């Protein structure tokens, strides 16, 4: 899906480039590239050790554990054995899922870790009380349909779309929407359609007890009367031609690509319509609503519960995958709780063996000036190199001052094409 979006954007930019005489661009990768990469994938079940290397210098094994973030998400355990040493396990948490979410199981713990690399996305906050998803969504649907409008929901194709279908099935089954009982629901995203099929095919391994109970009673948690899936561009464009109040679920969830932009174009100007975000509101004429609490990430309490489930404390916890301040906050919190922990900088090198941990290289740090204070932030070596190239480009521009207008125009067009390619 990402490759398809890149191909579409390249096609659109190249049409503009042909009119202006600018240099043509190529997508970073194509659908064919993605399909070729998929041939290299090897499916692995949860909780099964897979041998990655076995030779005279040692043995490395890998195991996936369901971490409850998305369908198929996993933490990764690496068991490393070297001659003359006790085998040790390093665990990479990945994104740790939220608990008590619809459809998929709660996150599991790998059981043992000598060294842990742990995410910290929400390491400084709690999600608060669980919202009434069904009640909140029902209220949005009822008020919008009563005004004759559509409910447009920008949604991630994997995970979020399926959760919404799960809620809407229950809303319809309980007859919560009065006067619009047969309201249609359109899922307008080829990737969301494929993802929903994968959810249905893997219910035995991935569904939680509540969703499994529905399946065992003969009900599909993701199917209900009035559900329509749009595959073709023509089917997508026809959705807004029908005046019937409806739900439109479409990707991308951030509204920066995909078919959702078409639906926003046709509904944002209509005050009777509602755009339902699981994110930040936008000031437009259509009513903007927010359905809170639908987070795939564990909060501070969830991270702590997952960490405490190990059979014994890891010898060291490396904190990553969070905003700088949050990662530092979570690492300090772990230290207060008696863990050996650190939030390393990008590019840092650590040596861990037989329970001993040492930092060999600190990594990349730099100071940035904010309005009130200076703060140390992490920056990658790749970004530093990119910034240096930007300075070099300015020097080259200055060196070309006084050059032929034709050459300067060509140079400017090349820079504009490069900016258009990466400014997205």
Model-derived segments and spans:
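Hard-cation-handling environments
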Residues: 140-279, 311, 326-328, 332-337, ...
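A general structural motif
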Residues: 96, 129-134, 225-235, 253-256, ...
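Charged, amphipathic alpha-helical linkers/stalks
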Residues: 143, 347-410
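Generic long, charged, amphipathic alpha-helical segments
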Residues: 281-307
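Short, surface-exposed amphipathic charged segments that create phosphate/polyanion-binding patches used
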Residues: 60-64, 198-206, 304-306, 354-365
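His/Asp/Glu-rich metal-coordinating catalytic cores
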Residues: 1-163, 169-184, 206-209
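Active-site metal-binding loops of divalent metal-dependent hydrolases
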Residues: 70, 94-96, 120-121, 156-158, ...
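C-terminal, active-site-flanking charged/polar segments
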Residues: 271, 322-367
């Amino acid at each position: 899906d990402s490759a398809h979006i890149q191909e579409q954007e390249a096609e659109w930019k190249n049409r503009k480039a042909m009119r202006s005489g600018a240099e043509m661009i190529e997508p970073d990768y194509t659908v064919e590239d993605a399909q070729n990469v998929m041939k290299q994938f090897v499916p692995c079940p949860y909780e099964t050790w897979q041998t990655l290397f076995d030779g005279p210098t040692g043995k490395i094994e890998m195991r996936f554990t369901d971490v409850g973030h998305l369908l198929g998400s996993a933490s990764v355990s690496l068991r490393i054995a070297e001659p003359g040493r006790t085998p040790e396990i390093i665990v990479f948490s990945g994104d740790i899922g939220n608990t008590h979410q619809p459809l998929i199981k709660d996150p599991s713990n790998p059981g043992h870790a000598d060294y842990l690399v742990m995410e910290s996305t929400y390491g400084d906050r709690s999600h608060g009380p669980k919202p009434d998803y069904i009640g909140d969504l029902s209220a949005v649907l009822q008020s919008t349909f009563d005004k004759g409008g559509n409910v447009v929901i920008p949604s991630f194709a994997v995970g979020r779309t399926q959760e919404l279908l799960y809620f809407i099935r229950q809303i319809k089954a309980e007859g919560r929407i009065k006067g619009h009982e047969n309201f249609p629901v359109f899922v307008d995203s080829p990737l969301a359609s494929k993802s929903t099929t994968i959810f249905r095919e893997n219910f035995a391994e991935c569904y939680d007890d509540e969703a499994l109970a529905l399946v065992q009673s003969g009900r599909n948690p993701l199917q209900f009367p009035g559900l329509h899936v749009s595959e073709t561009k023509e089917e997508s464009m026809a959705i807004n031609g029908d005046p019937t109040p409806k739900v439109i679920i479409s990707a991308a969830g951030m509204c920066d690509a995909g078919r959702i932009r078409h639906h926003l174009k046709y509904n944002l100007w209509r005050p009777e319509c509602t755009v339902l975000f699981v994110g930040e509101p936008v000031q437009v004429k259509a009513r903007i609503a927010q359905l809170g609490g639908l987070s795939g990430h564990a909060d501070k309490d969830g991270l702590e519960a997952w960490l405490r489930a190990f059979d014994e404390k890891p010898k060291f916890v490396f904190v990553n995958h969070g905003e700088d301040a949050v990662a530092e906050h979570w690492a300090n919190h772990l230290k207060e709780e008696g863990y050996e922990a650190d939030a390393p900088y990008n590019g840092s090198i650590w040596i861990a063996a037989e329970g001993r941990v040492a930092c060999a290289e600190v990594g990349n740090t730099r100071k940035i000036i904010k309005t009130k204070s200076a703060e140390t932030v992490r920056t990658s070596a790749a970004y530093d190199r990119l910034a240096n190239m930007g300075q070099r480009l300015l020097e080259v521009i200055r060196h070309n001052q006084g050059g032929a207008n034709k050459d300067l125009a060509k140079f400017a067009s090349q820079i504009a094409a490069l900016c258009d390619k990466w400014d997205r």
